[in-house]
């Protein structure tokens, strides 16, 4: 088999991936794909083996090379027919490394997978010619990102610098001026001045009360209690005239007599409910029968005038 045809087949299979084979890299991050026997070139058309497939139309849609990269000097050795030598970066010059997983494309089932290290912008100018010769201008990833819908985060310091003002603007603004809680507490509204309940020391005429709320409990004497019990035995409810008369006799006021009768009636109802005292109806009927018996026994005899008549 002809080796020339085999080499051209390998070149076409590896490098002629179309515009989709470009990997979205940083401006300062060169990539090292697998070996290709094609020389580095500043143009994307010619042999058709430099990422654009030799299509002038595809090359026309690609943006110009990034100004951060410099072409290879004229006296640089040709890299055709041999693989580029992988260089290990100096950890002192570049302490931070970010690794990107790169695929040459999805058109072939046996797509070559490899891993390349991304370097900062300090090593970009030195390796720019080498990356440009094998993968084209790296600054084209932004255009391809919009063309093929591949969204990848940008790690460029300049992009972060541009985004930082917007991030600062997205932060919560300063707290608006609000009334201080201490000031609101110190402020007294008109509705707070209204007193819902009258004080205990209020005057009777001011609120129209029948008696003072802070009335002291009355301590009745034995004589007063005996007279009140006698009156309650005959009359459960007193008239106004009888209440005034009893109050004057017992040296009490009218309100004290009225309240005592109210409490005595409630006490009587409680006793009847508990069964400690007979109901008032049976007791009144019994008293009425006893009164009728007494009237019959003490009824006066007929007068002599009525008998003679």
Swiss-Prot record:
Classification via InterPro entries: HD, HD_metazoa, Homeobox_CS, Homeodomain-like_sf, HXA1/B1/D1
Keyword entries, A-Z: Developmental protein, DNA-binding, Homeobox, Nucleus, Transcription, Transcription regulation
Disordered, as annotated region: 28-50, 264-309
Presence of keyword Transcription regulation: yes
Motif Antp-type hexapeptide: positions: 188-193
GO biological process: regulation of transcription by RNA polymerase II
Superkingdom of the source species: Eukaryota
DNA-binding region per Swiss-Prot/TrEMBL record: 213-272
Main location per the UniProt record: nucleus
Record's function text: Sequence-specific transcription factor which is part of a developmental regulatory system that provides cells with specific positional identities on the anterior-posterior axis. Acts on the anterior body structures.
Protein name per Swiss-Prot or TrEMBL: Homeobox protein Hox-B1
Native source organism of the sequence: Gallus gallus (Chicken)
């Amino acid at each position: 088999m002809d080796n020339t045809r085999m080499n051209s087949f390998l070149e076409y299979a590896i490098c002629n991936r179309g515009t989709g084979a470009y990997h979205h890299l940083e401006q300062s991050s060169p990539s090292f794909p697998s070996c290709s026997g094609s020389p580095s070139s500043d143009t994307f058309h010619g042999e058709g083996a430099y990422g654009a497939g030799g299509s002038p139309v595809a090359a026309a849609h690609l943006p110009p090379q990034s100004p951060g990269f410099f072409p290879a000097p004229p006296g640089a050795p040709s890299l055709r027919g041999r693989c580029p030598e992988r260089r290990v970066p100096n950890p002192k010059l570049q302490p931070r490394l970010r690794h990107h997983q790169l695929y040459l494309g999805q058109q072939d089932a046996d797509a070559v997978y490899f891993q390349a290290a991304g370097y900062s912008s300090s090593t970009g100018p030195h390796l720019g010619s080498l990356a440009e010769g094998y993968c084209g201008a790296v600054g084209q990833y932004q255009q391809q990102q919009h063309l093929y819908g591949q969204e990848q985060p940008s790690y460029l310091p300049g992009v972060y610098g541009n985004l930082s003002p917007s991030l600062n603007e997205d932060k919560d603004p300063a707290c608006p001026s609000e009334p201080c809680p201490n000031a609101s507490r110190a402020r007294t509204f008109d509705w707070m001045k209204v007193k819902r309940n009258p004080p205990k020391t209020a005057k009777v005429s001011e609120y129209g009360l029948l008696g003072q709320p802070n009335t002291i409990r009355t301590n009745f004497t034995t004589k007063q209690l005996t007279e009140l019990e006698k009156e309650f035995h005959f009359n459960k409810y007193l008239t106004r005239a009888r209440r005034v008369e009893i109050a004057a006799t017992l040296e009490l006021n009218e309100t004290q007599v009225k309240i005592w009768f109210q409490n005595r009636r409630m006490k009587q109802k409680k006793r009847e409910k508990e069964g400690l005292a007979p109901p008032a109806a049976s007791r009144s009927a019994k008293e009425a029968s006893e009164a009728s018996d007494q009237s019959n026994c003490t009824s006066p005899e007929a007068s002599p005038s009525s008998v003679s008549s």
